[in-house]
A protein has these predicted regions:
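Active-site region of the double-stranded beta-helix
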Residues: 1-125, 139-147, 151-205
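Histidine-centered metal-chelating micro-motifs
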Residues: 127-129, 134-138
């Protein structure tokens, strides 16, 4: 799969590179986070949310809405699934990493999605991006054998456990956590996911 760069114009349909933030302390805090052989995701880390840049991200990035700052770390080379939220997500790449992304508009009426439409973008270490709400995304892929580390900023409560019953039809069947609609690939066998990704479980070599 051809790997593009988030600095390329082709990324502008999916999101944008963010400027004007000082992530020095946030990147330092990320040094204390584990990088497992698989993938781990923690929605909220108090130490990160206590940093001055957190208030800046809340006000500049989300117009004052309460936010959570967490991380996604590990080793991965495959798509496995695609999710979307009702809001943008801000990522800060601590290491070089690759995002496999698509457009929500390409999801069919039966909530299937053709994985041949997925595009790959390198996010260089130290780069912050906004990933638009209509951009399908999931866990990053590592570039270096030591794995990937990525800061994840979202509206508070996103990706936390559902506290209400959901229907098993329509878009509701994709809702696996608060503000998280997920389409899985059968090869990945993600627990609770609707396996609507059709085609290869694409990845990077």
């Amino acid at each position: 799969m051809r790997i593009q760069n988030v600095a390329d114009d082709t990324f502008r349909r999916y999101g944008k590179v963010l400027e004007g933030y000082d992530f020095t302390e946030l990147l330092k805090e990320m040094k204390h986070t584990p990088v497992p052989e698989d993938v781990t995701y923690v929605p909220s880390v108090e130490e990160m949310e206590a940093l001055p840049v957190a208030k800046e991200l809340q006000n500049k990035g989300y117009g004052g809405l309460p936010i959570e700052i967490g991380y996604c770390n590990g080793h991965n080379k495959k798509l496995n699934g695609l999710e979307y939220h009702r809001s943008s997500e801000i990522n800060v790449a601590v290491t070089d990493l690759v995002l496999l992304i698509g457009h929500q508009q390409d999801v069919e009426k039966d909530f299937t999605y053709d994985t041949s439409k997925v595009e790959a973008f390198l996010v260089p270490a130290g780069t912050a991006i906004e990933v638009y709400a209509t951009t399908l995304h999931y866990a990053p892929c590592h570039v270096n054998e030591s794995g990937f580390q990525c800061v994840v900023v979202l509206p508070k409560g996103t990706n936390t456990e559902l506290t209400f019953e959901t229907a098993s039809e329509g878009e509701d069947k994709l809702l696996t956590a608060k503000n998280k609609w997920l389409i899985g690939h059968e090869e990945a066998a993600i627990e609770g996911a609707f396996n609507g990704l059709k085609g290869a479980n694409v990845g990077i070599d």
